[in-house]
């Protein structure tokens, strides 16, 4: 009877262990599952500031990264990280209307100058990762290839035209060459090529839903193109538009760690 009791107890212990192991593995994505994720840092910053009483707390979603991955097997996946930044600002400034002032020196009539700034940046990382672990917390390692593109362009629009009668019109912005005004300022487009390795861990707090942390090393090379400025000026009473090359193309390389400041590279992932 004692031996039967011990056998039954051992069998029950083994059953509970298998049940626990099965329930843990049920939290993980399986081969053929697709995942989408986003950075957790902005949300954790917001919650942290809310609990410590920071005034003017707001959710800052700028500079966010989207994550996508597809599981080839239960323990391996291909992945894609996409970061898009597109910024445009329009500045309007009042200036004296030169034509009205010529007709009436006491005129206070104003018109507008406008400066339009555009910045675009794109970064794509494609890679492969392998997972290892039998409980809800499991680690991973992998490698990435990276491609990035960026450009900057500033355009100007003026209320007072540059003419033979008004070769030095009133303009809102300074810092321009004598007798000339910018129409465009364009920095050379930049291309980034990189290869890297990464490691990290994920915790599945719900089936197919996890929070993860990742850090890595990236070797990258940046190639910058020709920059130029477009200006308007008067030459011997003739209106002339000049294209001036201001930056020669360049090339640089670097070695970077992929771990931002606040919480590290934390992210949420949802699989289906």
Label the predicted regions.
Residues 25, 52-56, 113-117, 132, ...:
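Outer-membrane beta-barrel domain signature
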């Amino acid at each position: 009877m004692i031996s039967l009791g011990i056998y039954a107890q051992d069998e029950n212990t083994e059953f509970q262990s298998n049940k626990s192991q099965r329930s843990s593995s049920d939290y993980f994505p399986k081969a053929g599952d697709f995942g989408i994720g986003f950075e957790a840092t902005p949300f954790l910053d917001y919650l942290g500031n809310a609990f410590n009483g920071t005034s003017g707390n707001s959710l800052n979603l700028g500079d966010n990264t989207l994550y996508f991955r597809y599981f080839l097997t239960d323990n391996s996946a291909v992945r894609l990280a996409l970061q898009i930044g597109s910024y445009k600002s329009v500045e309007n400034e009042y200036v004296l209307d030169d034509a009205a002032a010529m007709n009436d020196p006491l005129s206070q009539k104003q018109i507008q100058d406008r400066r339009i700034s555009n910045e675009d940046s794109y970064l794509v990382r494609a890679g492969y990762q392998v997972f290892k672990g039998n409980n809800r917390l499991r680690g991973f390692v992998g490698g990435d290839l990276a491609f990035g593109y960026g450009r900057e362009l500033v355009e100007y629009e003026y209320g007072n035209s540059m003419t033979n009668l008004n070769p030095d019109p009133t303009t809102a912005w300074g810092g321009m060459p004598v007798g000339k005004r910018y129409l465009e300022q364009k920095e050379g487009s930049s291309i980034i090529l990189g290869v890297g390795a990464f490691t990290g861990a994920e915790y599945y707090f719900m089936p197919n839903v996890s929070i993860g942390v990742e850090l890595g090393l990236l070797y990258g090379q940046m190639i910058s193109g020709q920059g130029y400025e477009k200006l308007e000026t008067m030459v011997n009473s003739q209106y002339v538009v000049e294209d001036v090359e201001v930056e020669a193309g360049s090339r640089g390389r670097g070695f970077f760690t992929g771990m931002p400041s606040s919480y590290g590279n934390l992210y949420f992932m949802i699989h289906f």
